[in-house]
Amino acid sequence: LIVDGAHNPAGAQALVDTIKYIPKENYAKCWLLMGVFADKEYKKIGQIMSDCSDTLICFKPSGDRGLKADKLAETMQQYYSKVIIEENAATAIKYVLEHASDGDMIISFGSLSTIKMVEDAVAFWEVAHNV
């Protein structure tokens, strides 16, 4: 699991450039989770990140600035073959951890504010599943 702010195009490109150093044989599938504020360049961020995966899970960060997951998903349909809508970081993490296989890579990005939310959701899931 990689959790990165990547809340602007430069950050997204840096993340993609870093991911390219991970040999593809080291992971079976790459899952992307994106929660972003409405005032960010989310279309460009999502387009850049599509170099890593064809699957995107969209969620709304908490607070008034958070872009609704359905709006994000609608925008991202052109870049990803599979776009999933989840209510928040916790449900996005729950979804991906229930559907990902051992050896899959999971990357969460889009807002610095979601880092703690994602970390908390993972910790809760691990406790609930005795991981």
Task: Please annotate each region the language model reported.
Residues 1-55:
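Nucleotide phosphate-binding/pyrophosphate-handling subdomain across enzymes
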Residues 111-131:
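Glycine/aspartate-rich loop-and-adjacent alpha/beta segment that forms the canonical ThDP
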Residues 29-31, 55-58, 126-131:
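Short hydrophobic/aromatic-enriched beta-strand-loop microsegments
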Residues 12-13, 42-44, 68-69, 117-120:
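Short glycine-/acidic-enriched loop or helix-start segments at secondary-structure transitions
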